[in-house]
Regions:
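Phosphate-binding loop of NTP-binding sites
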Residues: 1-134, 138-149, 201, 210
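Adenine nucleotide phosphate-binding catalytic loops in nucleotide-utilizing enzymes
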Residues: 101, 107-114, 128-129, 144-225
Length: 225
């Protein structure tokens, strides 16, 4: 219908790429966990009073839709590797949650997928950083090819932001995050699963690197559901 009426039709990623030119963009990529991680990042930025614009592929938790338009300088966007669309985006900083053999109708094999994530990460400007999960074997294999500042997180001992002392209270995670061995304190989630501990840790790492306090991140994580 739009084409019949001569209204331009463009892909989601291309539109996001244009929006990113006008904002300081935080881009969340990875095979799994993108929507949740994007939503937690958004919750932290809102708790910090930064009124971000948030765009996810699913529904923004607590918003009832796939987008929330804010008046602040930040755009927080889920970035999908499907059909290589995330290569149209211009992130200021990014998270890569994991890399898995998915969308093999678009990619030849896992090596092709890893190549795309390297291209994505290397689009980040010199003043940004890419936050990556050191627990993921495929992420580990691309680290040497990343030319931009890399910040690691995970349960792995070598991670800059390391999860420690994980336990579950009434089925929900309670854990400590260490930044270069120094404790940021205890964090609690209202969403279950070890995978969500990693998603939250990625969001906290990005927040700290962008100058948001651990206390603000802690409060946002505790209230996120």
């Amino acid at each position: 219908e739009a084409r019949n009426r001569r209204i331009p039709v463009i892909r989601r990623a291309e539109m996001l790429g244009e929006l990113m030119r006008m904002k300081y963009t935080l881009s969340i990529a990875g095979t799994h966990g993108k929507t949740t991680t994007t939503s937690i990042v958004g919750a932290i930025w809102e708790e910090a009073g930064l009124d971000p614009t948030i765009i996810v592929g699913g529904v923004v938790k607590g918003k009832g839709s796939g987008a929330k338009v804010g008046k602040g300088d930040y755009l927080i966007a889920e970035s999908d590797e499907f059909d290589r669309s995330f290569l149209s985006m211009m992130p200021s900083s990014a998270i890569i949650t994991n890399i898995d053999a998915d969308h093999l109708d678009t990619y030849e094999n896992i090596e092709d997928i890893k190549d795309a994530f390297v291209q994505f990460a290397n689009k980040i400007p010199f003043y940004g950083q890419v936050i990556v999960c050191l627990d993921d074997p495929n992420v580990q294999q691309i680290l040497a090819r990343l030319k931009k500042p890399v910040i690691t997180y995970g349960f792995t001992r070598q991670a800059k932001y390391r999860v420690d002392n994980l336990r579950f209270e009434k089925g929900f995670p309670v854990f400590e995050i260490l930044n270069d061995g120094e404790s940021l304190g205890e964090f609690k989630l209202q969403i279950p699963g070890r995978h969500n501990v990693l998603n939250a840790t990625a969001a906290v790492a990005l927040a700290i690197e962008e100058g948001i306090s651990a206390d603000i991140a802690r409060k946002a994580c505790a209230e996120f559901e």
